[in-house]
Amino acid sequence: MTEDMSEDGFYPKHDFQRPHLSDAPICWPVLSATERHDAAEDLKDWVRWLVYRYGLDPRTVTPCWTMHGELVEEISALRTGWISCYTWPLDGSALLAWHASFAEARVRLSEWISRNGCRPGEHRG
């Protein structure tokens, strides 16, 4: 793998910025308006990467996911778990466990989106 993945044909050039990636879990109710805004922007960057990296479609992460508290909480938990896989002390099997949790989370995300009835370009919240 090359150091700059954008130069590798397998990794197409992406248009997202690297998230700040604070390793603390996001507890939305206790954040100030500024902290909530910053955390939301960071989470949006991570979700853009997640959607790109795993080829997720709108049935899993709808474009209006930020307007659904249950999706924000689930995605926040996924991000926190993912970050913890890369913090010390490292656990070699942590990413495998995260992927198992991610598989379960995709089912829940899809079910919530299905119940909400949202589609690309159409929010029904």
Q: Where would I find each of the regions flagged by the language model?
A:
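Short, solvent-exposed segments of well-ordered alpha helices
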Residues: V30, T34-E41, T62-V72, L96
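Amphipathic alpha-helical interaction modules
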Residues: V51-C85
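Amphipathic alpha-helical binding modules
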Residues: W88-G125
